[in-house]
Amino acid sequence: MWNGYDARLVDSDGAQKNGIEKVRAEMAGRGVLLDVARWAGVDFFEDGIAISANDLDECAKSQNVEIKQGDFVIVRTGQMEQRLDAEEWGGYAGGDAPGLAFDTAEWIYNKEIAAICTDTWGCEVRPNETKDAQQPWHWVVIPMIGITMGEIFYLRDLAKDCDEDKVYEFFFCAPPLPITKAVGSPINPMAIK
């Protein structure tokens, strides 16, 4: 677990350390949308497409936005919209998906961002880039970096607004429910421009 705590501190009684209630007041700040689907010229990325650290940098450059320490970075792949439009959810939760490549773990660490969020069910590309590890990106970014993740974000309206005015930064607020000893929570994220 993050900050040197043993994973055995999470059991049927919940998280004895690092519970979600501890970060409730911290989930607000500068948000940045990286619309990688629009940057790549596609409506949505196909399942299994890995978005690299270089892709994130190039997308930010094309949007004329700089990722700064403490930012909440929100990555749009278009997958949520594609599933909504097709009215097809089979395999969405737990199945193959576009997502962040393993090399983005180092990018996250170097940028010192507060959180990473996507419109996919797990942020990380599926199938994974490695055959010998299940969800290797998660095994690095959660316990080693301590990153907070947001998943299954609906980004169509935000992406449209950002594309229209070419402003990809905003005030972002997404406090979790104060569920004592929980390791995650539903949220109602808001981007305020």
Role assignments for model-derived ranges:
Residues 1-193:
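Active-/binding-site microenvironments in catalytic and ligand-binding cores
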